[in-house]
Amino acid sequence: MGVEREANAMETNPDEQPSGGLVRRVVAFDVGDRRIGVAVSDPLGFTAQPLFTLHRTGGKGGHRAEMKSVARVLRKHSVAEAVVGNPLYMSGDQSPQAAKAQAFAEELRAEFGLVVHLWDERLTTTEAHRHLDAGGHAVGHERRQIIDQVAAVLVLQSFLDARANQAARSAAAAGPE
């Protein structure tokens, strides 16, 4: 591999940002009225792992506590960008919950200066239930504690896979040097 090829490989390497710094993790949020599932990527941006479920308490005090929890996640995991699940109807139209997800995304942009991606999350909760059923996870309270995390993982993994596929297509289109 020549010097030119190595330099080109760095441009499409998911471990590099255009600024030349190391890519930091991507965090995903599955935003609901009562809970927010949180997942984070590995440092290279290949895989998604569940972090926790943030329980929403409402009111100004509850909202401040939510944002403090988000800030801790961003600092602890050196997050560079975020993905927020965008719950669209199967037709592609906006659901009522989509406006709430978009407002949350805007707040992340404004408060933390993050690059935030709204990502189609259709059927992720259904798929999350299937994963939990296949793993023999209990129903009721235990399931509610983790279902949003699993949905956030599915949203994030979909985003990471799409990003990797785009990088591969771009590299293939550039052709050999």
Give the label of every model feature segment.
Residues G2-A28, R34-E177:
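Phosphate- and other anionic-substrate recognition elements at nucleic-acid/protein interfaces
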